[in-house]
Each structure stands twice: as structure tokens, then as C-alpha cells.
UniProtKB/Swiss-Prot annotation:
Main location: cytoplasm
Extra facts: In the reaction, the free carboxyl group of octanoic acid is attached via an amide linkage to the epsilon-amino group of a specific lysine residue of lipoyl domains of lipoate-dependent enzymes.
Native species: Burkholderia ambifaria (strain MC40-6)
Catalytic residues of the enzyme: C199 (acyl-thioester intermediate)
UniProt protein name: Octanoyltransferase
Pathway note: Protein modification; protein lipoylation via endogenous pathway; protein N(6)-(lipoyl)lysine from octanoyl-[acyl-carrier-protein]: step 1/2
Coiled coil: none
Length: 251
């Protein structure tokens, strides 16, 4: 699997189409940035800088990215959840909530840089909207999934992989604004998850869409997910316009 570097594409999502074809004006416009394959530290530093320097007039943004292999450990995370210290995958300590997780090729990572006060959103409501967007995205591929109380993320609803985690979520709120976000596993090498207790849960199975016999294209899933996120954030049923696709292969 590979991702060719592409320029950052900024797509203001100001007007979308309703199911009936009539224009719908979202409550708060959002800019979608498709950042391609990018080192985790680059994204981390950029989202912190964006949040630290934003003002009341700064627009909200959603960043879509794919990272090279990396473990990230939340600010209250226990390093003991990294079970194999010499795996060859770097570990980065970060300031989001949650424990340890893995990012790698074939996984969609979405960062939500939102002014919650302007959107009149409580953190719990934001988490629910994000989880709903993931559930709706998976449903578009005939995959049933659920949330679990007290365990942010999305889990397989039934079948041989019932209870397995397919999407992770972790946020940081600073001065009323969010950053970090979510990851959704499409088609990836899942072996690095065996070297950790995913999100701090020993023995938690982690799967991707391919494990569930869905041969989904990374770009298509990413576009669906971004559309559902924007629709849920703005309380509309309309899907967002599709930004330019990343040069991406699921091979």
C-alpha cells in the first residue's frame, strides 16, 4: 500500500446539496484539507499551532491524513500498554485523551479543528456526533457497528468479530476548541495492534473493513466519512461535496 505525496487541497464546504437537490447552507462552514501521507509529528505540531493561534474569526477545519506506522500515547496513558518495546514502530506521547493506539497505512485519520463555543457544542455531544458519523459511514458499506458506554470508539455489532474495535477516537479541548480526532481502519496491516493493549484494553481485538470482507476504496470511505461528519456537525442530512481525491492505492 502506498500514498503518493500530494499538495494540500483546501475545500471550503459552504453549500451542499440536499437529497431533493435544493441548496442547504450549513450552520458553520468548514474547510476540508486533504493532507496525503504525512508523518504523525508533522500533523501533531500543525494542529497544535493552528489551535494556539486561532482567533474568534478563524474558520473551522477538518484534516484528512494517512500516517506512516506510529504508536501514540494519550496524556494520561500508561506506557505499560505498549507490550513490545522493540517493535520498530516509534512511540509519540501526545496531549489527547485516551491511552495507546496505532496509526498506519490503510487507516483514515481525521482531525477536527472546531470552535465548540461558536458551534454551541458540548464535548460529549461532539463525541456522539463523531461516533454517529462513523456508524453511518460503515452502514453505507453494509457494516453494522455500535458505540460502547465509557469506551469511546466504534465496535463491530455482530458476527465472528463482534465487539472488535474498528475505529478509535481521542480529542483535546483547548480554549473551547477541539483538535485530534478519529481513525477508521479500512485495509491495513493489523499486526502492530498485537504489540499494544489498544486504548488500554488487554486482549481487545482490532479489525479493519477488509477483515469484515468489505473491499472498500480508501478515498471513497474517506469522502463518505467527511460528508457524514459535516452533515452531523451542522445538523443537516445533506452530504458534503467531495474534495479532490488523494492519489491512493489499497494494494
Amino acid at each position: 500500500m502506498s500514498v503518493s505525496p500530494v499538495p494540500i487541497v483546501s475545500t471550503p464546504v459552504a453549500v451542499s446539496e440536499s437529497p431533493a437537490g435544493s441548496p442547504v447552507q450549513p450552520a458553520v462552514p468548514v474547510t476540508v484539507r486533504w493532507r496525503g501521507s504525512e508523518a504523525y509529528e508533522t500533523s501533531f505540531d500543525a494542529m497544535r499551532a493552528f489551535t494556539d493561534t486561532r482567533t474568534a474569526d478563524t474558520g473551522d477545519e477538518i484534516w484528512v491524513v494517512e500516517h506512516p506506522p506510529v504508536y501514540t500515547l494519550g496524556q494520561a496513558g500508561d506506557p505499560a500498554h505498549l507490550l513490545v518495546a522493540d517493535s520498530g514502530v516509534p512511540l509519540v506521547k501526545v496531549d489527547r485523551g485516551g491511552q495507546i493506539t496505532y496509526h498506519g497505512p490503510g487507516q483514515i485519520v481525521v482531525y477536527l479543528l472546531l470552535d465548540l463555543r461558536r458551534r454551541k457544542l458540548m464535548v460529549r455531544t461532539l463525541v456522539t456526533k463523531i461516533e454517529e458519523a462513523v456508524i453511518e459511514t460503515l452502514a453505507a458499506y453494509n457494516l453494522a457497528s455500535v458505540r460502547k458506554a465509557g469506551a469511546p470508539g466504534i465496535y463491530v455489532a455482530s458476527g465472528v468479530h463482534e465487539g472488535a474495535k474498528i475505529a478509535a477516537l481521542g480529542l483535546k479541548i483547548r480554549n473551547g476548541c477541539s483538535y485530534h480526532g478519529l481513525s477508521l481502519n479500512v485495509k491495513m496491516d493489523l499486526r502492530p495492534f498485537l504489540a499494544i493493549n489498544p486504548c488500554g484494553y488487554a486482549g481487545l481485538e482490532t479489525v479493519d473493513m477488509a477483515s469484515l470482507e468489505v473491499a472498500a476504496d480508501w478515498n471513497d470511505v474517506a469522502h463518505t466519512l467527511v460528508g457524514r461528519l459535516i452533515a452531523n456537525l451542522d445538523g443537516e442530512s445533506a452530504a458534503a461535496d467531495k474534495p479532490q481525491a488523494l492519489e491512493h492505492s489499497n494494494d
